[in-house]
Structure formats: C-alpha cells, structure tokens
Regions:
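Terminal alpha-helical segments
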Residues: 1-114
Length: 114
C-alpha cells in the first residue's frame, strides 16, 4: 500500500491516498494487536483496542491515538461521502505522521520478538 504513495501524489488522487495511508496504518495496528494476542474484528474495534491497550497505558501518545482516529474518519469520508473530497493539503500533511506511526508500531512489534 505504501509503495503507491508517490504515484498517487503525482496523479493527485487524494481520496485514494487517504485510503491507502489509513489501511497501511490499520494493518500495522492490527498486526500489533494480534502479536499481543488481541482479536481484531473491525475497524472500530481496532481503534478502541489501540486506545485501550496502547494509548491509555502510555505506550503511544494521546496525539498518536487521535491521529489514528482522524485517519479513520478521513478515509471513511473519502470512501463513502460523495460530497467530500480530500484536499492536497489535508493529505500531504498526514503522510509523514502516518509513516512515523507505522515505524513506531513496527519497532514495537520487533521489540516483542516478532
């Protein structure tokens, strides 16, 4: 999914880019939950568990938890709201934080020995 970022930026496919960034983040969060023996049944469930087990315990910041929730909302609007288009500015400012959060999750998983 992340291999598509540059191509989608070049083409100006902001809605699709929001989708890909969110799903990359969702899959990272899901992998972390699974590695810790927690079930992932839905997008909302993953978000709730991320906040419950990682944000509230201080492993991830409140800002990171909020960012994850914002990315889910942005993706839902981009995918399902016919009257909403993600702007270039909205998505470009979210690329680096998404990649940073994924890297932090990958490090957490790696530190656990997976």
């Amino acid at each position: 999914m992340l291999t598509q970022v540059d191509g989608l930026k070049e083409k100006g496919f902001w809605d699709t880019l929001a989708n890909r960034l969110y799903y990359a983040l969702f899959h990272a969060v899901s992998a972390m939950l699974i590695c810790d023996g927690r079930e992932v049944g839905s997008h909302k469930g993953a978000a709730i568990r991320f906040h419950q087990f990682y944000v509230k315990t201080g492993l991830f910041t409140i800002e990171e938890g909020s960012f994850y929730s914002q990315m889910e909302t942005l993706r839902e609007k981009a995918d399902y709201n016919c009257y909403f288009d993600v702007t270039e500015a909205e998505i470009l400012e979210r690329i680096a934080p998404t990649l940073q959060l994924i890297e932090k999750i990958e490090q957490y998983i790696s530190d656990k020995g997976y």
